[in-house]
Amino acid sequence: MTTEYLDEERDLPLPRQKKGIDHTQTEPIRGFFGVKDMFAFENVGFTRSSEGKRYLVCGECEQGPVGFVDPVTEMNYVSPERLDVLPDVAAAAVEAGK
């Protein structure tokens, strides 16, 4: 399994949207771990395409999004920040899995 770290900032929709607002509220998130096969992540599902974008969600509670699918490369990226995992801990886990 090939894993990569994407050190870029991307806007992800907020997990909870305020009512009465006519657009999707987002927040900038920096740093994502990516794999080609989304099933390499435990308990991750994906949303239907919205505005040409697909997002990854928790497979157990369906909270999210916790990441996104790159439409060009079809890589699946999750944010350690959204998973409450420290980037150093996640990086060590990825390194150990190589």
UniProtKB/Swiss-Prot annotation:
Residues 1-10 have a biased composition (Acidic residues). The lineage of its organism: Eukaryota, Metazoa, Ecdysozoa, Nematoda, Chromadorea. One of its GO terms (molecular function) is guanyl-nucleotide exchange factor activity. One of its GO terms (biological process) is small GTPase-mediated signal transduction. Guanine-nucleotide-releasing protein that acts on members of the sec4/ypt1/rab subfamily. GO terms for cellular component: cytosol; membrane. Residues 1-25 are annotated as: Disordered. Belongs to the DSS4/MSS4 family. PANTHER family: GUANINE NUCLEOTIDE EXCHANGE FACTOR MSS4. It holds the Pfam family Mss4. Residues 1-86 form the MSS4 domain. This is Putative guanine nucleotide exchange factor MSS4 homolog. InterPro entries: Mss4 (IPR007515), Mss4-like_sf (IPR011057), Mss4/transl-control_tumour (IPR011323). Keywords: Guanine-nucleotide releasing factor, Protein transport, Transport. Gene3D superfamilies: Metal Binding Protein, Guanine Nucleotide Exchange Factor, Chain A.
